[in-house]
Design a protein with these regions (language model features):
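Structural micro-motif
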Residues: 45-53
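Hydrophobic anchor at the start of a short beta-strand
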Residues: 29
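Local sequence-structure signature of Cys/Sec-based thiol-disulfide redox active-site neighborhoods
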Residues: 1-25
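ATP/adenylate-binding site constellation spanning eukaryotic-like Ser/Thr protein kinases
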Residues: 9, 46, 66-69
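Non-catalytic, surface beta->alpha helical segment in thiol-disulfide oxidoreductase systems
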Residues: 56-78
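Acidic, metal-coordinating helix/loop segments flanking the phosphotransfer/catalytic sites
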Residues: 36-42
């Protein structure tokens, strides 16, 4: 099963939209603030929030930047 990591920061409206979307679909995910954990932001090449990373093992299968429901749907349904 894929591991989903959502990079977000406080007071970010698109970040809240991504969270609401994933919660509505009952999808489990981890939330990371790239300012609190910059080493993970560097590891996953996160430059802006929200960024959703879908991992298969250690391999990045999908990277979604911003709130893009169609891309999220594709990424989490694989």
């Amino acid at each position: 099963m894929a591991r989903i990591i959502k990079f977000e920061k406080n007071d970010c409206a698109p970040c809240a939209q991504v969270s609401a979307y994933l919660d509505n679909k009952d999808i489990s995910y981890e939330t990371i603030n790239p300012f609190d954990e910059p080493e993970l932001a560097v590891k996953f090449k996160v430059r802006t929030v929200p960024t959703v990373i879908v991992l298969d093992g250690e391999e990045v299968k999908h990277r979604i930047i911003g709130f893009k429901p169609e891309e999220l749907e594709t990424a989490v349904s694989e």
